[in-house]
Amino acid sequence: MPGFTDISWIAALIFTTDWVIRLGFALRVVMRRRSVGASLSWIGVIVLLPFVGAIIYLILGENRIGRLRGERFERIRPQLERYLDGLNEQAAADPQSLAPAQRALARHSTNRYGFPLLGGSSVELLPDADAIFARLVRDIDEAERTVHLAYYIWWNGGRVEGVIEALLRARQRGVTCRVLADAVGSKQFLRSGVCRRLRASGVEVVEVLPVGVWRMLFRRQDLRNHRKIAVIDGEIGYTGSMNMADPKTFKHEVGVGQWLDAMVRVTGPAVQALGLVFLSDFDTETDEAFGDFEAEGGLHDIQPTGSVVTQLLPSGPGFAREAIRETLLTAIFGAQ
């Protein structure tokens, strides 16, 4: 065509490619069936930022955890579901003991998460770091079979050293010790001599969701494992808001004061549910292919220790998407 230069062809190609990418990614956003606000926000980013918007969406727009990790969880799902069915038969709570709004919430949670409503547990609130560290170290020192710890942040120093020494003592007694530490939140710990010392003693320390430029192409790097769980001998469990970090020493240079956290110490059937979450995470991350959660995870039939009704609501890969948000909305709508 007269007057149509090579530069014009290049410009036309770039223009066409740009709009094909924008429209294609906008259609993908719509097909993901997010909330209206989230969908419009992502479409705005894609349309208003040529090429860059699509790259941002690829990195942050979808909950991609990696194909292999997803396949590993699907492999253990049947075993997990069988164990949950058995747990339900053994320790199911009577929904009629709950208020109507609580029954509706429990029914919704069971359908979305698959974890049953359990009775017969005891729950002790540990309101500060002093109580948490003291009880945890004591329980680890009394462990006979397994110590399982999963934390988003593991930060060396302060009273965390007491936990580390307790783990080393447990290994000397022949106790199986496993630690899950998030690659981002626990970077300081995972690169430290303390971690190497634990591994040398036989503690299985696993870096959860490793990060890297290459991995960015296949998995979102901002999706982290934020669990704070401890399960000891399949009989004692801890969960709550405190990471494995001493508030007196953790990032004190920031100058914002000590973090205020709390945990609960649980005994009874609820501990088995916590143990299952840890084991499913550990198996998914390591591909160890546990043949039997009960035998290798230290789980066993637990007699009632109290009268508290509990239900575990786990999030993360393999579990229902948006389930936590839906549960909170269900609770709010049922408020009286």
Regions found by a protein language model. Give the residues of each.
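N-terminal localization/anchoring segments of enzymes in phospholipid and broader phosphate metabolism
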Residues: M1-G334
